[in-house]
């Protein structure tokens, strides 16, 4: 994407001016973002976020909006609710004259995404929910969130820094600090409090059965698996995928895995311009099959075995994986500490490699 997308404004049914942009071409993907930390201009200055959005814009018309009270939208509000964000979305959809589109709801905005999809089944082709919940109490009664709510009334800077680190994980401190700066510019403490108090009593669980769109439920293992399972079980065409870790951002730390799930779900190429070399050094271009490996319970394993023995297990995992990839013509794209991302020229080769890996690890475990 060259340059910055043009910011436009839409008027809601209750009179608020909502900032939005659309970039790219093709069928639309509307991302509600992670309110209230939403600022259309500032988020594009954060490389990880910009790269994530540009992936959509490379193959679709990608739409983002700042909900009322946040970012570049009208900032003076008296209340915040699921209904208000639905009205904001309706205004942008009408302004862009979108007949149908893919809708993405992240964390807090998942409530509005579910409500909109239930009410406008004819417009939502697909629904993607990232770390979403259906009852405000499932999120705001968490001990960590209660601590942050208390911090909000005492120190705005401490609140945003702590909330950002909680959101992304303490291992991504630099990114969390940049996002905390965005957070402070995107919203005032008063509006932050309005959102937390206004959404605490929200409940869209009764609308799940009315969602007709195929739905992809993406959830972090340590951010409420039971909630995600309940959502997936209540939507008739839902598919649940669980990822390791705690980060509430889809672009950190395992963006490739998450992107491949989204791309597969809505019919995008995972890497439209990818050129890779297999183990024989032969270049290939076009559609690729991506294989991911992962050590389940890696953190718990390291705690149980200790650093020295844990590293021995990781080294053996790497040795077996690389040898098996070579045998099956796979190309190592990158390693992620406790897992690999590899590409293959066909689904068959990837499946055969996956089966071989399972057998190799089973044989190694049996010999220990």
Q: What positions do the PLM features span?
A:
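Catalytic NTP-binding/metal-coordinating core of nucleotidyl cyclase/transferase enzymes
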Residues: 276-360
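Ligand-binding pocket scaffold of soluble enzyme catalytic domains
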Residues: 2-271
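Short, flexible active-site-proximal loops enriched in glycine and acidic residues
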Residues: 104, 130, 328-329, 367-368
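A structural signal for long alpha-helical coiled-coils and helix-turn connectors
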Residues: 200, 299, 362-365
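Active-site phosphate-binding and catalytic loops of NTP-dependent enzymes
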Residues: 274-276, 361-368
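Residues at secondary-structure transition points
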Residues: 47, 80, 308, 312, ...
């Amino acid at each position: 994407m060259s340059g910055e997308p043009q910011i436009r404004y839409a008027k809601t049914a209750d009179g608020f001016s909502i900032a939005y942009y659309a970039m790219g071409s093709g069928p639309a993907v509307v991302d509600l973002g992670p309110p209230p930390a939403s600022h259309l201009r500032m988020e594009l200055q954060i490389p990880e976020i910009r790269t994530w959005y540009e992936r959509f814009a490379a193959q679709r018309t990608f739409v983002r909006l700042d909900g009322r009270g946040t970012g570049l939208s009208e900032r003076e509000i008296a209340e915040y609710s699921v209904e208000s964000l639905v009205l904001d979305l309706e205004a942008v959809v009408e302004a862009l004259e979108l007949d149908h589109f893919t809708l993405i709801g992240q964390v807090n905005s998942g409530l509005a995404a579910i409500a909109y999809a239930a009410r406008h089944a004819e417009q939502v082709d697909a629904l993607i929910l990232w770390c979403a919940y259906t009852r405000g109490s499932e999120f705001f009664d968490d001990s960590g969130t209660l601590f942050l709510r208390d911090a909000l009334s005492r120190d705005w800077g401490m609140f945003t820094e702590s909330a950002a680190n909680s959101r992304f994980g303490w291992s991504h401190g630099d990114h969390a600090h940049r996002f905390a700066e965005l957070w402070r510019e995107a919203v005032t403490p008063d509006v932050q409090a309005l959102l937390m108090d206004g959404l605490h009593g929200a409940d869209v669980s009764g609308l799940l059965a009315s969602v007709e769109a195929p739905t992809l439920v993406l959830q972090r293992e340590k951010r409420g698996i039971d909630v995600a399972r309940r959502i997936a079980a209540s939507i008739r065409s839902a598919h649940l995928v669980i990822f390791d870790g705690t980060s509430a951002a889809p672009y950190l730390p395992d963006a490739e895995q998450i992107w491949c799930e989204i791309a597969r779900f809505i019919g995008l190429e995972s890497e439209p311009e990818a050129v890779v070399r297999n183990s024989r050094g032969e270049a290939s271009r076009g559609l690729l099959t991506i294989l991911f490996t992962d050590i389940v319970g890696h953190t718990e394993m390291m705690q149980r075995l200790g650093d020295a023995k844990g590293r021995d297990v990781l080294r053996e995992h790497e040795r077996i994986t690389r040898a098996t990839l070579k045998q099956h013509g796979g190309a190592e794209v990158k390693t992620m500490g406790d897992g690999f991302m590899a590409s293959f020229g066909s689904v068959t080769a990837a499946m055969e490699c996956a089966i071989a890996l399972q057998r190799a690890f089973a044989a190694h475990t049996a010999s220990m």
